[in-house]
Amino acid sequence: MPVRRFFRKRRFKNFVSDYECCTTILDVGGQHYTWPIIGRVDGITLLNISVPQDTGGFQYVQGSGCEMPFADGAFDLAFSNSAIEHVGSVENQFKFASEMMRVGKRIYCQTPSRLFPVDPHLTTPFLHWLPISWLTPRLLRYFTLNGWLWKKPYEYDVTWISKRKLKKMFPGCKIKTERFLLLPKSFIVTSG
């Protein structure tokens, strides 16, 4: 989707220069199509619950971000873009954060802000501010842009994370607020 591509390009404008010294990168919960947008394709391993049929020539490992099958410090960078909010419970989010800090010598973890009026998962304004019980598959299918594009029921599996909670999950890390039109669009956690 062009809007998502615009924000990804903007977010990753300085990524390559900031992390060019990282020869091994673990992308937790990501997809291979993100990396050509960033401008990097070498030394990347993707960890996902399921491995897609089309791997795009990238190395995938099947596993959970809450229990990673790698040694401590196995990667120069543990990277995650919009995945930590999908692991379920707050307890799982803390496990995910802990595992990123364990396997990566440096980390980069981005998650969207609930305060932004457009939910990037739905590509629709304001619905994510409703009580979760209202976000039925039927509502998500017929009243969201993603529902119209995908034409299938959608299960809303997002557990939003505040900046304050991120500080607890990632002690000692920097947290930057990415803004659009002065509004907090997402939070980016970095270390190293």
Language model features by range: what are they?
Residues Y19, T23-P117, T190-S191:
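Conserved SAM-binding loop
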Residues K13, F94, S98, R164:
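Active-site phosphate/pyrophosphate- and oxyanion-stabilizing loops and adjacent acidic/basic residues
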Residues R106-P137:
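Conserved class I S-adenosyl-L-methionine
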Residues V158, L182-V189:
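Short hydrophobic/aromatic beta-strand or adjacent loop that forms the aromatic wall/cage
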Residues L122-P125, L140-Y154:
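Short, glycine-/aromatic-enriched active-site segment of Class I SAM-dependent methyltransferases
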Residues M1-E20:
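Class I SAM-dependent methyltransferase Rossmann-like catalytic core
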Residues K151-C173:
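Short alpha-helix
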Residues G172-L183:
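Conserved S-adenosyl-L-methionine
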